[in-house]
Amino acid sequence: MLPDEILIVATEASADLHAARALEELRKIRPGIRAFGVGGPCLRAAGLETLYPTEDLSVMGLAEVLPKIPKILGVLHGMREAAARRRPAVALLVDSPDFNLRLAKHLKRQGVKVVYYISPMIWAWRRGRARKIAQVVDRMLCILPFEERFYEGTGVSARFVGHPFAERALPGDVAGYRAALGLPAGRTTIALLPGSRRSEIDRIFPPMLDAAERIKARHPDVQFVVPVAVTLQEGVLRPALSRHASLEVRLVSGRADEVVGASDAVLVKSGTSTLETALMQRPMVVVYKMAWLSYWVARLLVRMSHFALVNILAGRTVVPELLQQEASPERMAAEIERLLSDPGARRAQLDGIAEVRRSLGEPGAARRVAEEIAGVLP
């Protein structure tokens, strides 16, 4: 076993970012540490020896996963073989439970300590998996405040480390962000965040643009801005944009925080982006569309009254949620219009968002993750 080598698996863009920050903090504690595994641009920049790139594995939903199963199984086998050959002291597995819990089972058999960062949402479904997790995970590091309590009595050693987004400073004013992006200061500005996966964009971006047409009919001066995830090429968005030549849509590579900060309102795909938008203290409408097979499976399994993270954390409806057929261009446009024209609705949402931000814990999540890893290293 190599005491100065760890395995890291981050199969999503957000996991890549959070894992990279944890690795940087770990090197402050153990300067000679080496890391290999699955990662994206952030982990590569942090010095990960990348055996498989995150970009090849990022998928969502049953229907989207099926075509990639051979590749996913190949990566799973490859990581098992690499771990057996290199014998790392610790594995840091980030999110992606369907992949990482399978890998964790094999790693435990090999004697590798498993630190799992970002708990699976078993509190929403699969509640019975907690005891199975206890058999394959040495430390569960939770980023939502209620998750540590959820694991009590299950045999899982869990700790709330705070949310990585709590690191962020309070946002600046709209004018500063618009200046940084080269956007006109006085125009109505709407951010469109359709997601970071090709399958999501194909399903969500076209109706978002249809909604944008309706918004423009009432606000002729409106400009739209889309932050393009670092794991995507702008060309993925072009087919949908080509059908809306009359819209003024600015594409920005990355810089999602600045795009949101520059906006009067945000139309955002459900996921971590909703929390990012909340931390920028901008009003939003949350939408999601998935393949119908995935949707019906989720309906059978999920036991939650909300699907937007902001509402889950608040325990009530703070932001509008539009799912499947409700995520129509008409509804999207109407909800955005309400945020633009109704000061009371806008203020009520922003007050709820402020409560959610306070619930995320103190800054320093990456440092606490690094301390947990260092604590199980030989």
Predicted regions and their residues:
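Nucleotide-activated sugar donor-binding and catalytic core shared by glycosyltransferases
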Residues: M1-P378
